[in-house]
């Protein structure tokens, strides 16, 4: 039996994906077969599932190399192609979609190395994604074709009540804002309370600075949220 849950206790959701303990279980249910290799406690373990059912229970198949640990998951999605009775009628994986998502993860987890290989064609595609610098490097990548208004990326990191924040800001000479929000590596396409709070804070801080400097009275300047975010690239 695949156990994907157990993260509710001990503060696990501070760092986990929060898929309600169904991640690999759902992948298994929607696969023709799924193989697991686990290196742990000096041993290599193996289990196999077909159409969601266990066909080879977890067993030790060998020794692990000194210090070797980790998990390898291999699966074949359940298919209706070529007369199959599976789930999916189209198994044309998008390399670009996978590459973009894995690149996000490589930026968000500074120093990690992710390799993506596509062996479906005569000319294989093999990409290694590895970045140092975290969200700062992410922002520089997003703005690589734009003219920055600041020499350095503004990076803010903090921790409060067990919640960690990692924020990078950089303004460029465009009129558009690019704001990417993530929670535990999961993209928040529609933002969230942390995005709303950030926008409100940015507007308040800029307005407060203009007022305290006297520039607002002198030039009769009133800054809106849209003004503060014009040309801003942000990863939160």
PLM feature spans:
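Short connector loops/turns at beta-strand edges and beta->alpha or beta->beta junctions
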Residues: 3, 76-78, 170-176
């Amino acid at each position: 039996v695949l156990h994907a849950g157990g993260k509710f206790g001990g503060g696990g959701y501070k760092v986990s994906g929060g898929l309600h303990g169904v991640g690999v279980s759902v992948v298994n249910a929607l696969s023709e077969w799924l193989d697991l290799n686990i290196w742990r406690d000096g041993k290599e373990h193996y289990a196999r599932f077909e159409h969601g059912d266990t066909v080879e229970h977890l067993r030790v198949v060998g020794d692990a190399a000194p210090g070797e640990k980790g998990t390898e998951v291999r699966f074949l999605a359940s298919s209706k192609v070529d007369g199959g009775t599976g789930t999916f009628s189209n198994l044309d994986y998008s390399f670009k979609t996978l590459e973009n998502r894995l690149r996000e993860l490589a930026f968000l987890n500074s120093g990690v190395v992710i390799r993506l290989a596509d062996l479906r064609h005569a000319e294989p595609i093999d990409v290694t994604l590895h970045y140092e610098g975290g969200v700062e490097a992410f922002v520089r990548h997003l703005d690589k074709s734009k003219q920055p208004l600041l020499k350095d990326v503004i990076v803010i990191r903090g921790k409060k009540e067990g919640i960690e924040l990692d924020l990078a800001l950089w303004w460029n000479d465009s009129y558009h804002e690019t704001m990417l929000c993530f929670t535990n590596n999961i993209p928040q396409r529609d933002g969230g309370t942390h995005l709303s709070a950030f926008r409100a804070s940015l507007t308040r801080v800029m307005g407060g600075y203009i007022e305290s400097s006297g520039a607002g009275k002198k030039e009769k300047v009133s800054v809106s949220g849209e003004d503060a975010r014009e040309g801003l690239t942000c990863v939160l």
